[in-house]
Amino acid sequence: MSKPLDVLLVTPPSRVQVYQELSRDFAAIEPPVWSGLLATFLRRHSCSVAILDAEAQGLDHQQTAEQIAAIAPRLAVFVIYGQQPSASTQCMPAGRKVCELLNALGDVPTLVMGTHPSALPRRTLLEEPYTYVCQGEGPATILGLVIALRAPQHSLREVPGLWHMEEGNPVGNAPAPLLTALDQELPGQSWDLLDMTRYRAHNWHCFDNLNQRSPYASLQTSLGCPFTCSFCCINAPFGMPMLRTWSPDNVIGQIDRLVRDYGVTNIKIPDEMFVLNRRHVIGICDRIIERGYRLNIWAYARVDTVQDEVLEKLARAGFTWLGLGIESGSQHVRDGVEKGRFGEGDIVATVDKIRSYGIHVAANYIFGLPDDTSESMRATLDLALALNTEWANFYCAMAYPGSPLYTLARRKQWTLPDDQDGPGWIGYSQHAYESCPLPTDHLTATQVLAFRDRAFVEYFTHPRYVSMLQRTFGAPVATHVAAMCEHQVRRRHHDLAARPAA
């Protein structure tokens, strides 16, 4: 009799609920970065591992549960991360649905991990259908749990970072220490366990060639962030604001493999703070330049961390886009969320500098921060229109579990999606029908959401923006964006507001 698979790493299907119609042609299909890293770690510790990416395979909840039950692993690990770190919470409902269906089919032990479970481990254990919850980044917890499941004499109390039930009571173990030698402990992703042809880049990432969005990969070069922005929950799995990096030699080795074995040229660097450590960035760029690869890479940057020397290297290495966190057009509002280290003049100068190196800018803005008013939100949109960057993401402020803003919202008793009468965790999705952002001291959640949706249309249909698209990328891209604007997301908030009084 063959031994059971030790670990099945599962990505539940959530894209359609999270992005509505935008999921079909416009949003990315992201490879599961954390599953790839965890698989490599576990393999190095003699565990048998497989990855079930139900999202990429187009499986529904029932099909996903049936596949897990058919594989019957020793442990099914639900890896709840989204396209960026704060997107974990909105993926929780899909995981719950699959796990409930799985529990009805058999007795497969389940563990849930991700930013959200790490932020609320006790609540997750009590409210969700999983057998176990992981608090922390995961590798040591999963390995320890597999060892305990293989040999029942091992106590669950010995598994670091594990939450489990004992005699009807939730028990949380001491956290696992963070991995520090990333090159040795998490040396890369197990791409051989994935069908790399299924993944595609964001539409804007490939504006230079919309027909070449696949193949695509997401490559982590660091973990964590040293900053403490109030709206961000990135450090929830790590327990502290800090930055750990893989070496440039390790990173180029992974890029070599992507290019050689999978034909990947579209690459996302999801590190929140990629353009921060000058030596790290230049070391990676120099190695790419030496190889002469023709890549299409995007990465995040901060307004106050972009230097000319770094930009020159990024451009030569194939970094065609930088995502820039501008957040608000109001200095007062930026001050309130720990983003006040730079002013509007700095923002304009940084955007101009990035573009002068031939790098496109994807600017990120947030409406509905705690100090926002109608006037300050309009100022943010006016700044976006003035900058006229090649792409813009417009978000509503969300008090994500694990962020300081969530703690503040609970203390001030602000309305949150997970309140008793709220839509639940899906309400933390920016694009879902059930989206439920924070109110501000001056505006209701409905007003914030309505402004965000109007801002999206105003920006992407603005004649100046459309003209810039045509000049920079050509008429087909302008036509593509116009088609995108026809897919207006529906909102529960607006439907409720539009109902006639009984």
Predicted regions and their residues:
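Radical SAM [4Fe-4S] cluster-binding motif and immediate context
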Residues: 184, 189-362, 369, 374-375, ...
